[in-house]
């Protein structure tokens, strides 16, 4: 039996209704209802981030690490409750792993060598605005880890969270933006 477009739409509507997804808030701490608005805000932020020193970016990352540790249990419980996947104890450990082991600016190094053919210099530079689709498994861990890496490199990011993990994802994004504001 061939599947028509209307059948696909009916299936999508049925699945979304079962998930009972609330509308996302708009514009507060980097949460937008429309993707284009999020992209425009990230472009504006990118103009600031790319001018930041490595020390400034590391200061934000340090604040993010602190906030992850302070909120690990809350995010773990939210993730398990919202998605029905995983267990709280393991997710708490994963959040601490993200806070303790995710590389920051220390991995952004300059390499240079010279020889008979001249000087070669390799320096890392930002890509700009990065788009990321996040999973329903480990939503907050993914957002937090990816942000620290992207920020270390001087980039900004727009996340499109999985609908089954929207509340947990919004919590993590708010936490990141609070850390950025608190760090100056």
Q: Which residues does each predicted region cover?
A:
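N-terminal Rossmann-like NAD(P)+-binding subdomain of aldehyde/semialdehyde dehydrogenases
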Residues: 3-121
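Rossmann-like NAD(P) dinucleotide-binding subdomain of oxidoreductase/dehydrogenase enzymes
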Residues: 110-184
